[in-house]
């Protein structure tokens, strides 16, 4: 049996049950990971899945990493032998096995004695308004509507706002100065609404907003739930390493970015310093997954597994191994220069 399959077979949650089934029903299972696109006109990467000996079982997969697809009358011979038990230890992901055995061994050794993001912080998604353009106002719009500034809260609407080390009050002032729609209409249940707000809610925009799925399924519809002021923000999708940006201006954020709340006694400065290490860059690649177009996606459940500032004893050979591993993972998601 042979299939062309999405490259998500190397990391997606649904790939785990599939490969468990394959290993329990076929004597031979091989996955050919193809780095260059099988279908160049599509954003989807594709790999090949081959299985033989139905009715048998296998204790390992064969993963063949090939640069480009070319027709052959049989699967490639060369490959990495991936024990099913070891695959399970990597959260049932094949992507880490694109790395060399030395890189995987070093990663496991360092990660075993290091802190992960989930040990020092909680990572979650931001709020969902149901109608972003209605609930986020420009300063000029709020003034025109007569909405008081104390009802508007500075908000990070997407990852483009995550620049530098911190979002500061100067950042928020720049949003105001450039009349950007980065101010959430933050209303609370039980508070009497000013006349200007009632008029805004009853405007055509408000009548349209309340019909959206999220709005019509909450009471009252105009109170956006789960609005928090985190210690930091983490980019959801990134080109290189995900950005970890301190929140020095008490901003809130939509679900286009992750919100990070530090555990008691933790310092965002120390966390950012550790976040910038090469090993943490590698960990983001290993624990995250490619989205397409060269992007790396980091779900909350993946983010908490990221190893923070893992030490490799500063040996040059290990440093080179980590750097090469980062480059390898980025090439496989088409981010590295010249990889397209």
Give the ranges of each region predicted by the language model.
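Polybasic, glycine- and aromatic-enriched phosphate-binding surface used to engage nucleic acids
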Residues: 96-316, 320-336
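Signature of N6-adenine DNA methyltransferases within the class I
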Residues: 1-134
């Amino acid at each position: 049996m042979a299939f062309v399959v999405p490259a998500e077979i190397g990391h997606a949650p649904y790939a785990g049950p599939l490969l468990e089934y394959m290993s329990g029903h076929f004597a031979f299972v091989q996955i050919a990971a193809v780095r260059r696109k099988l279908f160049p006109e599509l954003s989807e990467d594709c790999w090949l899945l081959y299985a033989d000996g139905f009715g048998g079982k296998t204790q390992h997969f064969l993963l063949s990493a090939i640069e480009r697809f070319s027709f052959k009358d049989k699967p490639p011979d060369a490959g990495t032998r991936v024990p099913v038990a070891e695959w399970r230890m990597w959260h049932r992901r094949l992507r880490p096995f694109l790395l060399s055995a030395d890189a995987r061994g070093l990663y496991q050794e360092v990660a075993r004695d290091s802190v992960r993001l989930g040990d020092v912080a909680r990572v979650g998604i931001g709020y969902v308004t149901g109608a972003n353009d209605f609930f986020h106002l420009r300063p000029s719009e709020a003034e025109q509507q007569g909405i008081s500034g104390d009802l508007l809260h500075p908000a990070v609407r997407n990852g483009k706002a995550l620049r530098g080390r911190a979002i500061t009050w100067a950042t928020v002032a720049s949003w105001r100065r450039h009349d950007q729609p980065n101010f959430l209409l933050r209303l609370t249940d039980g508070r009497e609404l000013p006349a200007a707000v009632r008029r805004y809610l009853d405007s055509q925009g408000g009548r349209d907003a309340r019909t959206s799925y999220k709005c019509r399924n909450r009471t009252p519809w105009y109170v956006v739930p789960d609005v928090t002021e985190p210690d930091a923000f983490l980019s959801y999708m990134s080109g290189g390493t995900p950005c970890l940006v301190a929140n020095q201006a008490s901003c809130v954020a939509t679900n286009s970015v992750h919100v990070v709340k530090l555990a008691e006694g933790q310092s965002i400065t120390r966390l950012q310093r550790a976040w910038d290490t090469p090993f943490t860059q590698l960990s983001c690649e290993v624990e995250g997954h490619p989205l397409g177009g060269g992007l790396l996606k980091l779900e909350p459940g993946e983010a908490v597994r990221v190893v923070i500032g893992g030490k490799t004893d500063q040996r040059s050979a290990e440093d080179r191994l980590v750097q090469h591993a980062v480059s390898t993972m980025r090439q496989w998601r088409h981010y590295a220069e010249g990889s397209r």
